[in-house]
Amino acid sequence: MSFDFMTPNKTKNSTVGNYAIVETSGTQFWLEADRYYDIDRINANVDETVTLDKVLLINDQKGFAIGKPYIKGASVQLKVMAHKRGPKIIVYKMRPKKKTRTKNGHRQELTRVMVTSISNGEKPKKATTSAKPNTKKPSTAVKSSKVEKTPE
């Protein structure tokens, strides 16, 4: 029995690269680098860069990093591409035999963003050009085996 329906938009042989699970506007999103996503409206202008700090999980070449609840120092950089509105959803309420009918429509405000980078907060290690020799002198302190007693 195969559960292929649980992984939409993924083929069996596809490999997933770097991704992060972030929280924004009360929902969690699976974000991959260099992809577009429509999320709830963000208060930012078009072509601005937005940083999301509430990162729950990161998967990169080194492996998984899971936060408790968030990963310290991790961030996802987003570029705002456009502001738009979602499809209209019709809400129709009716009470039978009472001639009571209401019809309302709703369009969700959305922001289209592109993920530019995913960072886990680790600073890159500086390459050392030469190893420093051990220049510390050994201590000449002598350990005393006598213990002084305080008068009671």
From Swiss-Prot:
UniProt keywords (A-Z) are: Ribonucleoprotein, Ribosomal protein, RNA-binding, rRNA-binding
A GO molecular-function descriptor = structural constituent of ribosome
GO BP, sorted A to Z: translation
Q: Which InterPro entries match?
A: bL21-like, bL21-like_sf, Ribosomal_bL21, Ribosomal_bL21_CS
Q: Which SUPFAM superfamilies match?
A: L21p-like
Q: Where is the composition biased (Polar residues)?
A: 127-143
Q: Choose one Gene Ontology CC annotation of this protein and give it.
A: ribonucleoprotein complex
Task: List the residue ranges of the region (Disordered).
Answer: 115-152
Q: Which HAMAP family match?
A: Ribosomal_bL21 (MF_01363)
What does this protein do, in the record's words? Answer: This protein binds to 23S rRNA in the presence of protein L20.
| Protein family | Belongs to the bacterial ribosomal protein bL21 family.
Q: How does it assemble?
A: Part of the 50S ribosomal subunit. Contacts protein L20.
Name this polypeptide is given: Large ribosomal subunit protein bL21
| Lineage per the UniProt record | Bacteria, Bacillati, Cyanobacteriota, Cyanophyceae, Synechococcales
Q: Which gene encodes it?
A: rplU
